[in-house]
């Protein structure tokens, strides 16, 4: 099967959608499918190689422009120039299916949706779109949504947003991970990483929605019980100093996973606009206990048949966060380790990938039905 993946965001800055597209592309290639990715900006050879892709499998849609979207700075492009590049990519690709990611915002995904004449699968990632994007979607998507032959959402919340603003009824298929990339670390003493308890925060701490200020406000109460508490922050942001907190900056995946593996708590204090808790899964895959804000997207990935695999607290409430961290630290370190690893395994690409490919088949069938033509066979499936 020839699959065209359309990513709306530049790969110059890491993000959940970009990582998902790369992971999916790499998995599809492993299964013998032909893959091509188009996105704004450039993708480095080393970044592509992390998922088994090569530069010839990436096409640039032109220069990326930073805009504020969903509480973050997204690097996208849109307009005549990108449209011409997308049209050329579609014509040369001769794809069996075109897979758009985040089609609710004005990006190259909408251009591809308008320009393609092939079966279309669309994945909705956004749980809380910006007002401007909603207005745009209300004007444009109703006229174009019929071009989507199969719809996916990464979470139940993202599915609700997609249905409300575009009328589609997506199938929920979460983001994928390569479980083997996350070595499971078991506790060998009271604390997972050494002589002191360790709490790890991961993300762009300058963005208010990441909840770093909630964490710092919660720490004094935790330190009252654990004065030797160690706190590390992994992620980008302006240089700053917070007493008792180490800022490690951006780390490669191997280093980041090593820190997660030795963490006594992975803390996720985000205040909103999270559609999927991918980092919670990554932390659990490494064996780290999770303490998270009770966002709907986080509860979805933290829940198994027995209940919550971790501790949660009220969104934005530092006192509640303190109590949740204290409860977690009082427990045996590996109390929920096996359950967490099992939850993460549910999102391995060996599980997620076939679900996505099944939606490609649905797209082909719906494409044929809606256009009144003989069903287009998806080669290689």
From Swiss-Prot:
Amino acids binding a 1,2-diacyl-sn-glycero-3-phospho-(1D-myo-inositol): 18, 69-70, 75
Keywords: Cell membrane, Glycosyltransferase, Lipid biosynthesis, Lipid metabolism, Magnesium, Membrane, Phospholipid biosynthesis, Phospholipid metabolism, Transferase
GO cellular component entries: plasma membrane
Gene3D superfamilies assigned: Glycogen Phosphorylase B
Membrane topology per record: Peripheral membrane protein
Superkingdom: Bacteria
Keyword Magnesium: yes
GO terms for biological process, alphabetical: carbohydrate derivative biosynthetic process; phosphatidylinositol metabolic process; phospholipid biosynthetic process
Pathway membership: Phospholipid metabolism; phosphatidylinositol metabolism
Compartments it resides in: Cell membrane
Residues that bind GDP-alpha-D-mannose: 9, 16, 204, 209-210, 251-253, 256, 274-278, 282
GO MF annotation terms: phosphatidylinositol alpha-mannosyltransferase activity
Sequence similarity: Belongs to the glycosyltransferase group 1 family. Glycosyltransferase 4 subfamily.
PANTHER family cross-referenced by the UniProt entry: SULFOQUINOVOSYL TRANSFERASE SQD2
Its biological purpose: Involved in the biosynthesis of phosphatidyl-myo-inositol mannosides (PIM) which are early precursors in the biosynthesis of lipomannans (LM) and lipoarabinomannans (LAM). Catalyzes the addition of a mannosyl residue from GDP-D-mannose (GDP-Man) to the position 2 of the carrier lipid phosphatidyl-myo-inositol (PI) to generate a phosphatidyl-myo-inositol bearing an alpha-1,2-linked mannose residue (PIM1).
Assembly information from the UniProt record: Monomer.
Protein's UniProt name: Phosphatidyl-myo-inositol mannosyltransferase
Organism of derivation: Propionibacterium freudenreichii subsp. shermanii (strain ATCC 9614 / DSM 4902 / CIP 103027 / NCIMB 8099 / CIRM-BIA1)
Name of the encoding gene: pimA
């Amino acid at each position: 099967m020839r699959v065209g993946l359309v990513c709306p965001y530049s790969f110059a800055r890491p993000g959940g959608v970009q990582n998902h597209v790369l992971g999916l592309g790499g998995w599809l290639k492993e299964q013998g499918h032909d893959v091509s990715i188009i996105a704004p900006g450039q993708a480095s050879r080393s970044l592509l190689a992390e998922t088994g892709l090569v530069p010839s499998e990436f096409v640039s849609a032109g220069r990326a422009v930073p805009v504020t979207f969903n509480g973050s700075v997204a690097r996208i492009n849109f307009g005549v120039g990108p449209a011409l590049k997308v049209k050329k990519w579609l014509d040369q690709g001769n794809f069996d299916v075109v897979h758009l990611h985040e089609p609710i915002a004005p990006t190259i995904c909408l251009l591809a949706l308008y320009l393609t004449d092939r079966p279309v699968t669309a994945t909705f990632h956004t749980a809380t779109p910006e007002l401007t994007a909603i207005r745009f979607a209300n004007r444009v998507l109703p006229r174009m949504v019929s071009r989507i032959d199969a719809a996916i959402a990464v979470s139940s919340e993202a599915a609700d947003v997609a249905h409300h603003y575009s009328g589609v009824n997506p199938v929920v298929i979460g983001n994928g991970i390569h479980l083997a990339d996350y070595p499971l670390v078991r506790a060998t003493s009271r604390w997972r990483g050494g002589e002191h308890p360790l709490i790890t925060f991961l993300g762009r701490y300058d963005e208010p929605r990441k909840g770093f200020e909630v964490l710092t406000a919660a720490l004094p109460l935790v330190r009252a019980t654990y004065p030797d508490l160690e706190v590390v922050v992994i992620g980008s942001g302006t240089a700053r100093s917070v007493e008792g907190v180490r800022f490690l900056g951006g780390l490669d995946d191997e280093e980041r996973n090593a820190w997660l593996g030795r963490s006594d708590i992975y803390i996720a204090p985000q205040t909103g606009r999270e559609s999927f808790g991918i980092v919670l899964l990554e932390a659990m895959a490494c064996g780290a206990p999770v303490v998270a804000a009770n966002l709907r997207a986080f509860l979805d990935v933290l829940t198994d048949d027995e209940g919550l695999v971790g501790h949660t607290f009220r969104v934005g409430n530092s006192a509640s966060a303190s109590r949740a961290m204290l409860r977690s630290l009082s427990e045996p370190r590996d109390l929920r380790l096996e359950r967490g690893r099992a939850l993460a395994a549910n999102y391995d690409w060996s599980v997620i990938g076939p679900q996505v490919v099944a939606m490609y088949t649905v797209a082909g069938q719906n494409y044929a039905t809606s256009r009144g033509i003989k069903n287009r066979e998806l080669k290689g499936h």
